[in-house]
């Protein structure tokens, strides 16, 4: 299937180069873009400096373009996507916008024919070879390539403070069975075994639990409609998840993900499961040293598996400043742009030729694991399911957090899988 994809990609790219010469010429030195560039993102706070560095790099290459940074602040893009929906549907798109690579973009804006094909841009910049083939497939369809990946994040990570664990006499659990053994010991010392935050972080935790219970083959089968959502395996996922919730903090809905990390750092909680943007928060905001002041492992039961998500930017149909947008995408996909952003952001480059000497201790281990581990996609961050399913799953999660009924949750999962085309 991969070979077929690349044959189609190569053919499309060859034909597209003729169009590129005409329509993508704003990238050429003799035809530099001028005017404005409005970019739409949710990177702010701890991730803000990385975006600022990327904008600064763009401005150094294109000083005649004024960058309008229309960032909408929140934890995982939920608020930003609401604003973006209004603008896209209202015929007022930004020039380029941040989106999770995969079905979050393809199942929404590509399906509704509101994005431009970037195949010719990829071909002209040599990106077909620069990015992993699996990632190219993820951001493409038979009809084209739809976004430029900026980074790779890992979702399935367990964070802790080594000095605290030593004081409490426990070690990081590599399975949920091990977690359930040490959790009572932690609780007896007045420590919350696992810090949790607002509801989207519960979905984030759930996907790591599901990967541990199902394994990578069944996890992938779930999103292809080849695993019954009401099967014993899926009910077991909800049962294990329910057991884990018994060892979390009651005030979770009122906390941000950063505050959950703070609980771990301050010794109120032993562990937190969060993506590797937590490393950027601890390193840049809290000034902690990776590998010394804080540690990490794959979330329990997922060793040797890398649950990933990728932030990317696309080109909407009807972008007001199309030439500037193409120049922006060119900077994003370049090696310099990728390393400039990711070295500050706590993520790793999506490119195969990044300069790891610029990265911190965590990022170096992430790059190593990305090359050797089994790669699977994230649900909570838009890789394996479209936006409709994600929104419906948030409602299922909210229901489960109230009634804690695994069988009802499994049935609700099947209902929304049918509704959103996962089960046909």
Where does each model-flagged region fall?
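Conserved N-terminal structural module of periplasmic/extracytoplasmic solute-binding proteins
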Residues: 26-111, 125, 172, 253, ...
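Extracytoplasmic/periplasmic substrate-binding proteins
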Residues: 42, 55, 108, 205, ...
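Extracytoplasmic/periplasmic substrate-recognition and gating elements
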Residues: 60-61, 66, 90, 168, ...
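A structural signal for short loop-to-beta-strand junctions that line the ligand-binding cleft
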Residues: 87, 94-95, 125-163, 192-193, ...
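Hinge/lid segment of periplasmic solute-binding proteins
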Residues: 100-155, 180, 291, 361
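Periplasmic solute-binding protein
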Residues: 106-111, 134-174, 198-222, 307-314, ...
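Glycine-centered hinge/linker elements that transmit conformational signals in sensory
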Residues: 183-186, 224-254
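C-terminal capping/gating helix-and-loop segments adjacent to ligand/active sites or protein-protein/ligand interfaces
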Residues: 223, 347-351, 365-422
């Amino acid at each position: 299937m991969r070979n077929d994809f690349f044959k189609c990609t190569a053919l499309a790219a060859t034909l597209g180069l003729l169009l590129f010469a005409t329509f993508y010429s704003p990238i050429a030195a003799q035809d530099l873009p001028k005017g404005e560039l409005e970019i739409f993102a949710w990177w702010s706070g701890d991730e803000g400096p990385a975006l600022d560095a990327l904008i600064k790099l763009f401005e150094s290459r294109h000083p005649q373009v004024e960058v309008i940074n229309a960032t909408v602040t929140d934890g995982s893009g939920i608020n930003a996507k609401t604003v973006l929906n209004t603008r896209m549907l209202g015929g007022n798109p930004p020039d380029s916008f941040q989106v999770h690579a995969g079905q979050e973009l393809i199942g929404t804006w590509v399906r509704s024919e509101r994005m431009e094909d970037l195949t010719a841009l990829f071909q002209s910049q040599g990106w077909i070879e620069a990015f992993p083939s699996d990632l190219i497939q993820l951001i493409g369809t038979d009809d084209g390539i739809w976004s430029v990946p900026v980074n790779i994040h890992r979702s399935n990570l367990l964070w802790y403070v080594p000095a605290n664990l030593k004081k409490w006499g426990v070690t990081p659990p590599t399975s949920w069975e091990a977690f359930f053994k040490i959790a009572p010991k932690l609780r007896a010392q007045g420590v919350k075994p696992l810090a949790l935050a607002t509801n989207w972080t519960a979905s984030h935790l759930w996907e790591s639990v599901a990967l541990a219970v199902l394994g990578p083959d069944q996890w992938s089968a779930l999103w292809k409609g080849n695993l019954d959502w009401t099967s014993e395996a899926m009910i077991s996922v909800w049962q294990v998840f329910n057991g884990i919730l018994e060892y979390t903090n009651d005030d979770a809905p009122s906390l941000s993900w950063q505050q959950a990390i703070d609980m771990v750092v301050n010794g109120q909680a032993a562990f937190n499961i969060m993506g590797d943007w937590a490393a950027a928060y601890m390193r840049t905001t809290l000034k902690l040293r990776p590998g010394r002041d804080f540690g990490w492992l794959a979330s329990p039961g997922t060793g040797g598996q890398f649950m990933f998500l990728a932030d990317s930017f696309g080109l909407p149909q009807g972008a007001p400043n199309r030439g500037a947008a193409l120049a922006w995408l060119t900077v994003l996909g370049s090696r310099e742009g990728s390393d400039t952003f990711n070295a500050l952001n706590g993520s790793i480059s999506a490119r195969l030729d990044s300069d790891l000497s610029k990265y911190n201790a965590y990022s170096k281990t992430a790059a190593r694991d990305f090359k050797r581990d089994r790669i699977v996609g994230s649900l909570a961050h838009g890789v394996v399911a479209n936006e409709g399913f994600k929104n419906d799953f948030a409602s299922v999660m909210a229901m489960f957090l109230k009634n804690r009924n695994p069988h009802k949750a499994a049935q609700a999962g099947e209902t929304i899988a049918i509704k959103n085309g996962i089960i046909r």
